[in-house]
Structure formats: structure tokens, C-alpha cells
């Protein structure tokens, strides 16, 4: 009885979600929802490579080998990122769209809050080698921003990401499809009971 008494109160926290539209494996547009973080480029390549490795290797080896396989498969690409009524064009190797801060225990999008009605994007524009020189700062405390090699963008409505060739998209750790992709904020769709 006492263990569930807090459920009777009115204390809730409203979470936003992301409505993601991208191409599936057959080139058809699909729409799905996610609540935390989406990744395009390096992060997606790493996760897809990790999933292809045999489970008998164990979780640590799969993460380690997945990073290096995904890293090897990643190239810097010409990107067009639309956000609300603005846009950014440039070259990058990794795009993070954040509604929440953490993925797999890593504070990847440190300025994102899931109930603020805003999506944040980080476009990694530096050299691909920045991926492993930045990792200690990211893994320790999310101290990778601000950085001259990371473009920070915010959108109250939506992001769109296009590249000079299709790039893999994952969200909340699950494969979603490929670019072109849009990420629309859907405010306060989940109520978390406190």
C-alpha cells in the first residue's frame, strides 16, 4: 500500500517525442516515433556494425569492434540540415538529434531536455579522427560542446537532414532507415508519473 501511494498524486513530468520520417530499405517513406536520441552517420554505422557481430564475442568486444567497423565505414558527407525556417549546409560525419541527453550511458546531447518542446542537433563537422579524440570528453561528462568542430542547432518545430548519398538513421538504438529524414517535435506526449 505505501509503496504505490505516490501514484495517487498529481506529480507528473511531460515528455516530448520525435516523429521521424525517413526512407526504408525499399526506398519508401516511413514514419515512426522515438523519445530520446537519433543518430545519422557515424553513430548509426557503429550500431549497425555492432549488431552484425556474433553474440559469442560478448558485449564489450562487440562495442569495441562495432566502433572500429562503423568508423571505417564512415565518410565525411555534404549535408543540408533544415531547422524550423533556417538551414545549415556543410560537411560532416555525424549528426545527433536530441530530445534527451543520454544514450547507452553516454551524455551525447548535453543540452537536450525531454520536456522543453525543443529538439537539439549536433553536427560533427571536424575530421573523422575527432570521433575518437573526442570520445573521452563525451564519455566522462558530455563535455564535447561547445567545440569549433561541432555545429549546435535548435528547433522548436522540426529538423530535416539530407546528404549527398543516403546515410543510415538510428533512433533510441534501433535502426530506422536512411536519409533524407525529418525529425518533428511532438510536445508533451508522454506523462511520466513521479
What are these regions (language model features)?
Residues 83-89, 113, 123-194:
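ATP/nucleoside-binding phosphotransfer catalytic cores, i.e., glycine-rich phosphate-binding loops
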Residues 75-77, 91-93, 115-119, 155-157:
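A generic structural signal for short beta-strands and their flanking turns/coil linkers
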Residues 1-93:
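Catalytic core of DAGKc-family lipid kinases
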Residues 54-62, 103-105, 111-132:
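Gly/Ser/Thr-rich active-site loops/lids in small-molecule metabolic enzymes
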Residues 39, 43, 96-110, 175:
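Glycine-rich phosphate/pyrophosphate-binding beta-alpha loops
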Residues 20-21, 39, 49, 98, ...:
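Short beta-strand-to-turn element immediately C-terminal to the catalytic PLP-Schiff-base lysine
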Amino acid at each position: 500500500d505505501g509503496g504505490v501511494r505516490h501514484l495517487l498524486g498529481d506529480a507528473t513530468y511531460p515528455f516530448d517525442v520525435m516523429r521521424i520520417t525517413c526512407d526504408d530499405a525499399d526506398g519508401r517513406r516511413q514514419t515512426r516515433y522515438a523519445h530520446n536520441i537519433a543518430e545519422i552517420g557515424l553513430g548509426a554505422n557503429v550500431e549497425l556494425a555492432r549488431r552484425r557481430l556474433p553474440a559469442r564475442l560478448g558485449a564489450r568486444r562487440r562495442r569495441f569492434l562495432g566502433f572500429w567497423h562503423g568508423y571505417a565505414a564512415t565518410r565525411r558527407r555534404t549535408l543540408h540540415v533544415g531547422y524550423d525556417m533556417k538551414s545549415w549546409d556543410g560537411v560532416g560525419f555525424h549528426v545527433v538529434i536530441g530530445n534527451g541527453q543520454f544514450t547507452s550511458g553516454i551524455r551525447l546531447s548535453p543540452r537536450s531536455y525531454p520536456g522543453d518542446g525543443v529538439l537539439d542537433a549536433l553536427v560533427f563537422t571536424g575530421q573523422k579522427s575527432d570521433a575518437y579524440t573526442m570520445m573521452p570528453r563525451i564519455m566522462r561528462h558530455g563535455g564535447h560542446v561547445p567545440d569549433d568542430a561541432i555545429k549546435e542547432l535548435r528547433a522548436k518545430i522540426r529538423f530535416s537532414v539530407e546528404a549527398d548519398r543516403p546515410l543510415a538513421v538510428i533512433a533510441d538504438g534501433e535502426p530506422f532507415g536512411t536519409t533524407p529524414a525529418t525529425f518533428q517535435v511532438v510536445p508533451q506526449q508522454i506523462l511520466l508519473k513521479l
